[in-house]
Amino acid sequence: MARTTPIERYRNIGIVAHVDAGKTTTTERVLFYTGMSHKIGEVHDGAATTDWMVQEQERGITITSAAVTTFWRGMEAQFAEHRINIIDTPGHVDFTIEVERSLRVLDGAVVVFCGSSGVEPQSETVWRQADKYHVPRLVFVNKMDRAGADFDRVINQIRNRLGATCVPIQLNIGAEENFKGVIDLIKMKAINWSETDQGMTFTYEDIPANLAAKAAEMHEYLVEAAAEASDELMNKYLEEGELSEVEIKTALRQRTINNEIVLATCGSAFKNKGVQAVLDAVVDFLPAPIDVPAITGIDESENEVKRPPDDNAPFAALAFKIATDPFVGTLTFIRVYSGVLESGAGVYNSVKQKRERVGRIVQMHANDRTELKEVRAGDIAAAIGLKDVTTGDTLCDNNHRVILERMDFPEPVITIAVEPRSKADQDKMGIALQKLAAEDPSFKVETDEESAQTLISGMGELHLDIIVDRMRREFGVECNVGKPQVAYRETIRSKVEVEGKFVRQSGGRGQFGHVWLRIEPLEEGAGYEFVNEIVGGVVPREFIPAVDKGIQEQMKNGVLAGYPVLDVRVSLFDGSYHDVDSNEMAFKIAGSMGFKKGALEATPVLLEPCMKVEVTTPEDYMGDVVGDLNRRRGIIEGMDDGIAGVKLVHAVVPLSEMFGYATDLRSASQGRASYSMEFLKYTDAPQNIAKAIIESRN
C-alpha cells in the first residue's frame, strides 16, 4: 500500500494553552471546518468531541490528550490536501505531564491565549516546555469577543513575559462585543466570516479606514521580520521597499521553524471567526516531519544513531500515551519517526527489551476510529494488542534496535491513602491502580509497609481527585480517601567512605558479605548513580548487582524518617568475600547496611517540596494575601500589575503549608482572589519542622 499523503504535506501539531483559554473549543472548530465533525460540539454542553472521558465532560476541562487526524485544503481550497494530526493537550497544571509528553512527539504547536486574561502562569509553564523541546509555534489569541479583550496587550505580554519575538500576521477589527473579523497583514485585506453558515464562507474586503495606518505600520514590521531571514531578502527589501507574498511566507516559515520568531493570529473560536485562518497558518508556517531535525537515539553499542523521516529507513516509533478503552482494551498511541509498521507485525520494545506483536492499528478521530493496514514515517496512530508498553518506550525493528530518548517525568509531590470500601473492591482496586499507573508516569502507587495502606501519589490534589473518580467510574471501585500527605524526601550533604559487613558463621553454611562504599551527594534532580570501581575481583562480579539492589532498597526506605533518598552517587570500591559463605543475599544485606550507616554520617537532611504559587487578587486584599503567604513560610518573589486594578503575587511556599489554601483565600478575599500552584523544587526543611516530622515517623 503506497503513501496516500506525501510526508511534506503532514503537520503534526498540538494545541496547547492554560485552562480556559478556549483550546478545546478551538480544536472543535478545527474538526468542524476540516469536515470531520458535522455538528459543532460545545464545551458548555459537555459535548466536545475531544473531551471523551465523563469527568472531562462534567468538569469542562480536558484531561487526556486525544489524537485526532483531519485533512485541510485551505480557506480558499488553495492547497493540495494536507493531513493534520492534532493532539489536544490539557492545560491544568496538575496535568503538565500530558503536555510534556505531547510536545515530545509534535513537530509544531498552536498556543492559545485568552484575549482578556493574556499570559497566565500556566502559559509560562507550557511555553518553557515547548522551548525545552524546540517546538516551533504559532499564537492564536482567542476570545477576542470577551469583555476586556486586547490583542496588543497580549502580544506585549508574550514579548515581555515569555521573551519571544512575536510577529502578528493579523490585526483584529474591533474587540469585545464589537469584534467583527481580522485583517490579513500579509495580503493587506480584511477578512469577514459569514455569520449565517458558522463561518464556513468568508469575503475579502478593504481595510477599514480607521485601521489603515495601524495595519500599514504592522505590515511593515512583518515584512522587516521576513527580510531578516537572509541577506538577499534584506537587500531586496532595502532596494525595493517591499517583498512578494510568496517571499514573505517562505521567509516567515523558515524563521518560525528555526524558532527565531512566533507568528500571532487572533479571533474567537466560539463566534466562528479566525480558526480557519489558523489552519491556513499551520500549513503555511509550521514544519512537516521532514523540516525538523531527524530524531536521535542510542543503538545497542551505545552509539548515537539518527532515524530520518523516511519510509525506507528501519522502523522506529515512540509510545507517548497509553489509554484504556472499554471496547478494545489498551490503546498505545505512537508517533512513527521512520520506516513502516504493518498491522499484525512484530516489534521490539528496546526499553523493556521485549518483543511484542501489534494486533491492529487504528487512526483516532476524537472518539471514533478507522482501521489502518499500516502506518508510515510521520504518522500518529494507536496500536492495539501491545501487552507491556509504558509511556516513553521505543518500539523498533528487531534487526535495527534503537532507544529514542526517554522523557523525564517529575517526582510526585502529594500522597493520599486509599482504602477499598469492601472486600469486592479490594481486588478491583489493585487492577484499576495498575492500569492508571501504566497510563500516567507522574502517578505512583505503593504500599506502606507498616500500615499496609495503599498510597497513591501525584502532581496535585486535582490530579489525585480525578484518579479516584476514574477508579469509581471506569472500574466500579468505591474507595475511602485519607488526608493528603506531603511527599517528603531525604538526601545527604557530605561525602563519606563506609564499610558494610554482614557475617553469620556458626556451624554449617554461613553468610558473608563485605563491601566498602563511597557515598556522595549529587546535584538536584540527578537521581541515583551506582559506580562499580572493583578491581582484581575482590568482590566477585556476580555479587555486584546484589550490592546495588541492597543500596536501592535502603534508599527507598530512607534513613532519617522513612522517606526515599534522592540524588546520591554510591561507588563500590573495595570489599572481600568468602569462597563458601558468600552469596547474593549476604552482599545485598551488606550493601544495605553500608548505605544506611554511611548516609547517617553524610549529613542527612529532610527535603520538602516547595511550590511556585501565583495569586491574583484585587488590590484591597493585597496586604492580607501577602501576610498570609508569609505566615505559611512563603518567600515573596515579586509582584506585578494585572488588568483592571488586579495584582499578581509570585511566591514560593512549602506544599505542607498550602493545604486548605483555596478555602482560606476565598474567605480572606470574599471570593475575589484566585491562585495557581505548581511544583518547583525540593528544598531543605527547616530544622524545627524536620525534627518534628522525624520524631513523629520514628
Swiss-Prot record:
Residues 8-290 form the tr-type G domain. It is found in: Cytoplasm. GO terms for biological process: ribosome disassembly. GO terms for cellular component: cytoplasm. GO terms for molecular function: GTP binding; GTPase activity; guanosine tetraphosphate binding; translation elongation factor activity. Its main location: cytoplasm. It comes from the Bacteria. Pfam families: EFG_C, EFG_III, EFG_IV, GTP_EFTU, GTP_EFTU_D2. InterPro entries: EFG_II (IPR041095), EFG_III (IPR009022), EFG_III/V (IPR035647), EFG_IV (IPR047872), EFG_V (IPR035649), EFG_V-like (IPR000640), EFTu-like_2 (IPR004161), G_TR_CS (IPR031157). Keywords: Cytoplasm, Elongation factor, GTP-binding, Nucleotide-binding, Protein biosynthesis. GTP binds at residues 17-24, 88-92, 142-145. Belongs to the TRAFAC class translation factor GTPase superfamily. Classic translation factor GTPase family. EF-G/EF-2 subfamily. Catalyzes the GTP-dependent ribosomal translocation step during translation elongation. During this step, the ribosome changes from the pre-translocational (PRE) to the post-translocational (POST) state as the newly formed A-site-bound peptidyl-tRNA and P-site-bound deacylated tRNA move to the P and E sites, respectively. Catalyzes the coordinated movement of the two tRNA molecules, the mRNA and conformational changes in the ribosome. NCBIfam families: EF-G, PRK12740.1-5, small_GTP. PANTHER family: RIBOSOME-RELEASING FACTOR 2, MITOCHONDRIAL, TRANSLATION ELONGATION FACTOR G-RELATED. This is Elongation factor G 1.
